[in-house]
Amino acid sequence: GLGREFATQAEEILGIRPNVPLACVVAILEDTHSEPLRHPEDRVERMGGTSRWGVRDGALYGVVTLQGVDEAWLTDVLRPAVAGRVGVALARHGMAGAAAAFRLAARAAATLPAGEQRLVWASARLPELLLETSPEVGAMIEEQVLGPVMALPDRQRTTLLETLRALLRHGGSATSAAGELFCHRNTVMYRSRQLVELTGCDLQEPRGRLMLELAIIAHDLAVASGRGVA
């Protein structure tokens, strides 16, 4: 495939040993003039790293050797250069895993909304990758869990979804969520009870929280891809 072909060329040009860990980077080109990752090769080189980059089929592909450095190092190096959707995946055993890593990096980048400027590792987007692989499962989860919420008037729906996101970010803590939302804790607790009644899922129960997490991820993916309504 394309990823393996590019990785092989990078191996020949860079002289990378077969089993050296690699980071495979994919930055989506939104149009012919976009630059989702600005001068990545220069940035990596200035920081003492080795990389190879090229544009193929609507994306900027990169291979970065991770010999003597780690994922956090690469994130710090590339983040200031990010100007679009960028996905990164680790090929832990070198070139042999590069093709799969490129696929994961591309899919991770594609889970971000168009126009977002962000770098994500595939390993940090596993729920999104699973749901994006099977949109029909995501649609089923969203309908089953959030269906009654989505049927509410726009303002009420938006308020409850914002509250749900805040509660999920804060581990179900109404106090912390209230601080983020600039409202009273009792208001958040009232909305939380509404969410339980509408969804049948309780944030305080492991399975309920899992279903709510998956449902909101599925909803956001559908909106980002144009399949759903915010």
Where are the regions a protein language model picked out?
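Cytosolic nucleotide-utilizing catalytic cores of signal-transduction proteins
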Residues: 1-230
